[in-house]
């Protein structure tokens, strides 16, 4: 089955729904991301002692990697830039970015995408919080972090056709031409690594389906208000 990848489409089969280019880039950036994250995180705590940040300037994460041209409404992004609440992230053709959130969640945004961080509440002392993002179009891959580890139901992604409720997992969604495809990557309920199983609840006013097996996928068609049903691979 040929489907869309993060950066180029269509080129990959179901088990390579995640862009290999994206994964390799993330591995190379992992150590750098950790250093940047620590500097910005503790720097932001210090800044709070000296100034009051408005909601519009609330820090939610940093840019870990960039491919091509990625912008917000007011600036072109580069590696290491801060990302704030309510900013719209726009990735152009052949472009993409990885965002590392303060709770260590990772958002990978693919080409021709528009993603907004609508809600980000995080207490680093307890790892309590809530994350809500919306995908207007394009691709978003989510690896959940400390907030979801504490409370698996605390991360939601809104799409034009419905809502994706992450339950402490890794998944990808693609919004294109009135349809949303959502893939659960894992870990599944029968994983051999001793990891807590993850799942994604995909739903709207017409119904819902639970993805709880790795590489299970479902589609919502906005024009027909219909579901493709869950498929496992």
Residue ranges with predicted function:
Residues 7, 16-17, 26, 37:
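Aromatic (phenylalanine/tyrosine) cluster motif
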């Amino acid at each position: 089955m040929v489907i869309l990848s993060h950066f180029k489409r269509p080129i990959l089969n179901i088990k390579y729904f995640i862009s290999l280019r994206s994964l390799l880039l993330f591995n190379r950036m992992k150590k750098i991301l950790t250093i940047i994250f620590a500097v910005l995180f503790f720097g932001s705590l210090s800044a709070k002692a000296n100034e009051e940040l408005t909601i519009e300037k609330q820090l939610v994460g940093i840019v870990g990697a960039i491919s091509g041209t990625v912008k917000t409404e007011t600036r072109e992004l580069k590696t290491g830039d801060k990302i704030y609440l309510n900013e719209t992230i726009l990735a152009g053709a052949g472009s993409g970015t990885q965002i590392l959130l303060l709770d260590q969640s990772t958002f990978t945004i693919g080409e021709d995408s528009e993603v907004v961080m609508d809600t980000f509440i995080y207490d680093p002392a307890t790892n309590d919080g809530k994350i809500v993002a919306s995908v207007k179009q394009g691709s978003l891959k989510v690896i959940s972090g400390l907030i979801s580890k504490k409370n698996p139901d605390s991360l939601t992604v809104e799409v034009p056709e419905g809502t994706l409720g992450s339950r402490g997992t890794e998944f990808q969604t693609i919004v294109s031409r009135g349809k949303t495809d959502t893939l659960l990557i894992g870990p599944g309920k029968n994983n051999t690594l001793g990891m807590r199983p993850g799942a994604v609840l995909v739903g709207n006013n017409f119904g819902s389906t639970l993805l709880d097996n790795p590489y299970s996928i479902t589609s919502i068609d906005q024009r027909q208000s219909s579901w493709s049903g869950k498929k496992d691979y």
